[in-house]
């Protein structure tokens, strides 16, 4: 007996569901054609060819059910590494796909310059008279604008290639085998569209490696756990080392800072304009979120040299050798044996 999963697409959040499903169809067909041994998400087609059904009750799709487990958060570094491999493999399998064929399901989603421009415009307009109470957060975000916009600026200068990106690389968007905890398949492809590899890497790190939840009220506890960072980077680069350009590799560390700052601008802009986009549980929820992302970004600044060194070390090792699937490299950037993860102190 086969099991299936029926979903109704949220057409309020995604106002172009047909194009969204076409994006998914194109990338999953590419994966099945070029990498038939890989498991990929698959939505079934009607006789007329569409991989969706529209009726009076909504916009529907049908996929195979995959027996599995998911993790919202996880301290098991092997699971984190496997998640990194899953998202890295997703990138690798689509490295030869022309990203310009895809529709932008959320236009300007990671155009950090435009996010900042919108924040500054709303700051000037101050529609809800809230700017005065968040002046300190605004001033810090504006002080790091150029650093936060580095990925956008490099792409606009033609120095980074356009890739197919997932754009929601949380660990809970990977299905894992219940017994072995090996990654089975990447899911939730609704935001698949053109982007930069740093968007996927940076957002995964921003979410997975923070010591606290993104709405922790004690922002001083926020920071990047370098053990988790190392684990994810190692898995990700094991799969992508051969396909990434050196410029892309050099931006992976700063991408984490950029994505934290970008999300902080979004939370803060939403607060300034009346909490219209993100769901809130209490009046200052978006301020709390903003402060937590700022604290995370500040902590990343203090660890940026280590973050860049970890990425460079993993990339150099994996691009130059054919390591067996379960073989563990022993050299680390801090000169200690990797058993199995030994990055600089996560508490530093």
Which functions belong to the PLM regions below?
Residues 2-3, 9-117, 197, 213-214, ...:
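Conserved ATP-binding subdomain of kinase catalytic cores across diverse folds
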């Amino acid at each position: 007996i086969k099991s299936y999963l029926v979903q109704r697409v949220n057409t309020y959040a995604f106002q172009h569901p047909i194009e969204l499903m076409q994006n998914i169809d194109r990338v999953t067909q590419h994966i099945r054609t070029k990498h038939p041994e890989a498991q990929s998400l698959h939505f079934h087609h009607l006789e007329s060819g569409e991989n969706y059904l529209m009726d009076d009750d909504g916009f529907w799709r049908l996929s195979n059910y995959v027996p599995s487990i998911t993790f919202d958060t996880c301290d098991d570094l092997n699971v984190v590494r496997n998640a990194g491999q899953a998202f890295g493999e997703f990138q690798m399998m689509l490295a030869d796909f022309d990203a310009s064929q895809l529709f932008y399901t959320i236009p300007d989603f990671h155009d950090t310059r435009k996010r900042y421009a919108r924040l500054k415009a709303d700051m000037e307009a101050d529609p809800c008279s809230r700017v005065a109470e968040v002046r300190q957060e605004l001033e810090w975000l504006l002080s790091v604008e150029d650093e936060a916009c580095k990925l956008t600026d490099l792409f606009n200068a033609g120095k980074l290639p356009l890739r197919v990106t997932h754009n929601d690389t949380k660990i809970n968007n990977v299905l894992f085998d219940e017994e072995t905890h090996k990654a089975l398949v990447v899911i939730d492809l609704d935001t698949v569209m053109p982007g930069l590899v740093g968007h996927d890497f940076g957002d995964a790190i921003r979410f997975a490696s923070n010591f606290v939840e993104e709405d922790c009220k004690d922002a001083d506890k926020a920071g990047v756990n370098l053990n988790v960072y190392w684990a994810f980077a190692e898995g990700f680069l094991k799969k992508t080392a051969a396909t990434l350009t050196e410029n892309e590799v050099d931006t992976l560390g700063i991408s984490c800072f950029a994505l934290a700052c970008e999300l902080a601008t979004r939370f803060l802009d939403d607060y300034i304009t009346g909490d219209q986009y993100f769901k809130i549980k209490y009046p200052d929820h978006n301020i709390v979120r903003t402060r937590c992302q700022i604290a995370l970004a500040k902590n990343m600044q203090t660890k940026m040299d280590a973050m860049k060194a970890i990425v460079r070390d993993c990339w150099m090792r994996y691009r130059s050798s054919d390591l067996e699937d379960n073989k563990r490299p022993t050299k680390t950037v801090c000169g200690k044996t990797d058993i199995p993860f030994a990055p600089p102190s996560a508490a530093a």
